[in-house]
């Protein structure tokens, strides 16, 4: 027998400023209400949240709940992030917005590029990128007498430069400092079928320089057998589809770059804060560092909720009937801090025995970049500890502030640090 979900009055999409030791009360309110709760969506109409760990994993594997943006409410078009529909040429190559066999096909293409052994072989290059960025910040801090700011100066630039290095996209450090807005403009243009990447009236940044570098990486992958990620993608896309255009390859690697730096950058900011607050023992070995990273993954998910899913047909989830097209989110942060699965769930304890978390998702859309994010995290910690053993926060830990940017990103506002 099915019924209606309880309605919760709290706003899960609000973006209050919070301290590092405070988690939004919305998650507790959700759990108290039930495993499926109904809320008012910011763009209008109802939406449903899944708050229970086991039910969340069931939902993330349920083929009736899909990521097809065509099923989103019409009023959400142009209002809700991530629901733009790519032009027909590019749509089959959208890993995060296709399901079933189409998704399995794309996963087969992407998985070899993210092979853990292949990634581990690039550890030295990843460490070199981290070391160069941190050294530049330390030198600038020494000249100015002001602390280095690691959110704007490192947390996002580091994973951006790493993923570009792996893809064979020759992005320089100065370009990385402007690349976030450029990448957003590129993604928007690709999904709308827009023109040359510029919009003088709207102030959209010129994307031509970065687009040229992406094309350069694609052309190089076609000509050379150097095993960059782009080359691996090219080979496996050819095998799956028979052919692939330059535009399609550029679209795929643009998606990888954007996903590979934005959320990783958000997480690295939180991870750095925990390390620099002295929570990682000075003599921590590799296993202890790995446990520390895993606890940070649980405690500081860079996204509070999953991407939107929509009911392809009428479904009953947790005893609640959802109509066709029903928008559904899984409460990642809430399940990660559920006392039924974790002792002292709102405390940061690197030695806790259970690493159960939903930060990287579950089911077919489990994050393919998890191994890279973990490698970047461990490598960054190693470089920081070896080159700047006396690095510390420039402000008390309790004064750090973080906020959400809508439903899909949580990030520190700034992270001032003395690099010594």
UniProtKB/Swiss-Prot annotation:
Residues at which heme binds: 367
GO molecular function: heme binding; iron ion binding; oxidoreductase activity, acting on paired donors, with incorporation or reduction of molecular oxygen, NAD(P)H as one donor, and incorporation of one atom of oxygen
Catalytic activity: 13-deoxydaunorubicin + NADPH + O2 + H(+) = 13-dihydrodaunorubicin + NADP(+) + H2O; 13-dihydrodaunorubicin + NADPH + O2 + H(+) = daunorubicin + NADP(+) + 2 H2O; 13-deoxycarminomycin + NADPH + O2 + H(+) = 13-dihydrocarminomycin + NADP(+) + H2O; 13-dihydrocarminomycin + NADPH + O2 + H(+) = carminomycin + NADP(+) + 2 H2O
Pfam families tied to this protein: p450
Record flagged with keyword Heme: yes
Compartments it resides in: Cytoplasm
Entry superkingdom: Bacteria
Cross-referenced Gene3D superfamilies: Cytochrome P450
Keyword RNA-binding: no
Cofactor field: heme
One GO process term, biological-process aspect: doxorubicin metabolic process
Enzymatic class: oxidoreductase
Entry keywords, A to Z: Antibiotic biosynthesis, Cytoplasm, Heme, Iron, Metal-binding, Monooxygenase, NADP, Oxidoreductase
Annotated GO CC locations: cytoplasm
Pathway(s): Antibiotic biosynthesis; daunorubicin biosynthesis; Antibiotic biosynthesis; carminomycin biosynthesis; Antibiotic biosynthesis; doxorubicin biosynthesis
EC number from the UniProt entry: 1.14.13.181
InterPro entries, per database record: Cyt_P450 (IPR001128), Cyt_P450_B (IPR002397), Cyt_P450_CS (IPR017972), Cyt_P450_sf (IPR036396)
Further information: S.peucetius subsp. caesius ATCC 27952, a mutant strain derived from S.peucetius ATCC 29050, is the only organism reported to produce doxorubicin in vivo.
Record-linked PANTHER family: CYTOCHROME P450 YJIB-RELATED, P450, PUTATIVE (EUROFUNG)-RELATED
Family: Belongs to the cytochrome P450 family.
Subunit structure: Monomer.
Biological function: Involved in the biosynthesis of the anthracyclines carminomycin, daunorubicin (daunomycin) and doxorubicin (adriamycin) which are aromatic polyketide antibiotics that exhibit high cytotoxicity and are widely applied in the chemotherapy of a variety of cancers.
UniProt protein name: Cytochrome P-450 monooxygenase DoxA
Organism whose genome encodes this protein: Streptomyces peucetius subsp. caesius
Gene name in the database record: doxA
């Amino acid at each position: 027998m099915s019924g209606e979900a309880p309605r919760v009055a709290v706003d899960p999409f609000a973006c209050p400023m919070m301290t590092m030791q405070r988690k939004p009360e919305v998650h507790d309110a959700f759990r108290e209400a039930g495993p499926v709760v109904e809320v008012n969506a910011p763009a209008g109409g109802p939406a449903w949240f899944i708050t229970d760990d086991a039910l969340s994993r069931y939902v993330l594997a349920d083929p009736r709940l899909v990521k097809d943006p065509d099923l989103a409410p019409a009023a959400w078009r142009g209002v809700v992030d991530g629901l733009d529909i790519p032009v027909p040429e590019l749509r089959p190559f959208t890993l995060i917005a296709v399901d079933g066999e189409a998704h399995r096909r794309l996963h087969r293409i992407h998985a070899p590029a993210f092979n853990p052994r292949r990634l581990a072989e690039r550890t030295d290059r990843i460490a070199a990128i981290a070391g160069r960025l941190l050294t530049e910040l330390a030198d600038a801090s020494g000249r100015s007498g002001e602390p280095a700011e690691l959110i704007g100066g490192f947390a996002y630039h580091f994973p951006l430069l790493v993923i570009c290095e792996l893809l064979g996209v020759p992005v320089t450090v100065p370009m990385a400092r402007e690349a976030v807005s450029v990448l957003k403009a590129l993604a928007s243009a690709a999904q709308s079928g827009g023109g040359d990447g510029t919009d003088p009236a709207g102030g959209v940044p010129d994307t031509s320089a970065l687009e040229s570098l992406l094309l350069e990486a694609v052309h190089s992958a076609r000509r050379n057998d150097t095993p960059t990620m782009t080359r691996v993608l090219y080979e496996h896309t050819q095998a799956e589809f028979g052919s692939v255009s330059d535009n399609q390859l550029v679209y795929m690697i643009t998606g990888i770059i954007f996903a590979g730096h934005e959320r990783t950058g958000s997480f690295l900011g939180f991870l750095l804060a925990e390390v620099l607050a002295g929570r990682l023992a000075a003599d921590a070995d590799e296993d202890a560092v790995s446990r520390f990273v895993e606890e940070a993954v649980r405690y500081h998910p860079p996204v509070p909720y999953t991407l939107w899913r929509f009911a392809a047909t009428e479904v009953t989830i947790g005893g609640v009937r959802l109509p066709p097209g029903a928008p559904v989110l899984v409460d990642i942060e809430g399940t990660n801090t559920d006392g039924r699965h974790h002792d002292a769930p709102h405390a940061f304890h690197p030695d806790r025995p259970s690493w159960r978390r939903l930060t990287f998702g579950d089911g077919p859309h489990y994050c393919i970049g998890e191994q890279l994010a973990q490698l970047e995290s461990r490598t960054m910690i190693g470089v920081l500890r070896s080159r700047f053993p006396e690095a510390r926060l420039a402000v008390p830990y309790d004064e750090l502030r973080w906020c959400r940017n809508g439903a899909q990103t949580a990030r520190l506002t700034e992270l001032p640090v003395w690099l010594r």
